[in-house]
Amino acid sequence: MPAREIAFRLRERAMLAIERAWNGLRAAEPPPADAPSVALDSFAARFYISPQERQALPAFVQATFPEWIAKAVEEADALCDHRLQLLGYGTVDLGLEIDWHRDPVTGVEWPRRFWADYDLVNDGTYGDSKTIHELNRQQHLPRLGKAYFLTGEERYAVEAIDQIASWIAQNPEGVGINWHSSLEIAIRVLSWLWTIFFLLPSPAFTEQFARGVMQSVSAQLRHVCRYPSLYSSPNTHLIGEATALFVGGLLLDGTAETRKWRDLGARLLVREIGNQILDDGVHCELSTSYHCYAADFYMQALILAHRNGFDFAPEIAGKVEQMLEFVMHVTRPDGAIPQLGDDDGGRALALDRQDYHCYLDGLSSGAVLFGRADFKWQSRAFREETFWLLGRDACTVYAALPATCPETNRRDFPSAGYFVHRTGWTERDTHVVFDCGGLGAPTGGHGHADALSLVLFSGGRDLLI
């Protein structure tokens, strides 16, 4: 263990001891009277979509993409009944009153204790933490807020606000399973920031709620800032945490602390794209799912940085474009991505799709962001996530791009050990990926012992997996 890691772990242990002692006192104290509110104007001005265009968006979507509204309403109606799709379990019913500590699949309730006192690796008493974590990412809330934004139906806004308020009430700072993982906190913060954007016109978005949600967002980002996933096979965990710090710090900019979050997030994102993305643009863990996961986080940060004139290191854009080139080539003729390595079933941004069985929305956004006609060809259509990330003008840019078939039917990724061949770029063509790489990251990560295997897709179906 290097000296730097020893110092980091000793410092973390000291912080935990202080926080554990302070936690009981903190729970008894009232919230500070000067808790920050949402600076609605500045938040909206920095968001992905500008205040000038947001008012016209619902009518534009109704005229241009009415199917998006129909889908949003159908899902929002189910969410108002506390029914949602969760991982591979299908629809789960959260009950009349949502208990954010109860596993929605097994019904087992996780105990309330200091956040660092859970042993998720060795103690299986309460089951798999993945399901409770997935629920508490609250990635369904932006889709509920989106339905309100597109329809003006107030009950969707009220439901989203009620769920956030109930989460805050049930999860005091530092207590419970939902404070255990900095990555899960980071994804929840990103979900809340999108939800806030969609709900800003709602009468239910009161000053009292604004203060409460900002207290919680600040506490959660403060936690991520204190306890990033360093020296623990972090990889995509650290990328996700850095994205939340950067996005949250940039959107809420106004204090020394928010600028600290922004700058730390930016430094980590720049560092980790060099550490984790190989020379050929493939993520080091050699998992197609986690590759898309990392690309999705970087796209969120890169687009918001461009929107706000934040000067990222130039290698960020180049590496993200490389990552999308891998996605373009590895995507099969049916639009799906072969499942190489682990897949946890989650997603970094879930405004539309909830998994990475395909990542055509990333290619759609990449076509607009980088002016890539071949990305447009493979994305097949303008995707909803591109609209929310890049705004209405992205529709015009995408439409003006020619859809140009990629130049080659073969692409080698030698650093990763992937060799992709295809007979063409139509839906009936054959597509094969040879895996000649290693296990992935030095600690194994999400790679599999699958060297010299291959996946074959032909005639519209899997032949070898």
Where are these regions (language model features)?
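Short secondary-structure junctions and interdomain/linker hinges
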Residues: 5, 17, 21, 25-28, ...
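Boundary detector for helix-to-coil junctions that initiate low-complexity/charged tails
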Residues: 1-14
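Generic detection of long, well-ordered alpha-helical segments
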Residues: 4, 51, 58, 62, ...
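Acidic/polar residues at beta-strand termini and the immediately following turn/coil
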Residues: 103-105, 278, 342
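Carbohydrate-active enzyme catalytic cores, enriched for enzymes
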Residues: 282, 286-465
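Aromatic-lined, polymer-binding surfaces characteristic
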Residues: 110-122, 126-321, 325-337, 344
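Extended, charge-enriched "interface" segments that sit outside catalytic cores
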Residues: 17-123, 130-135
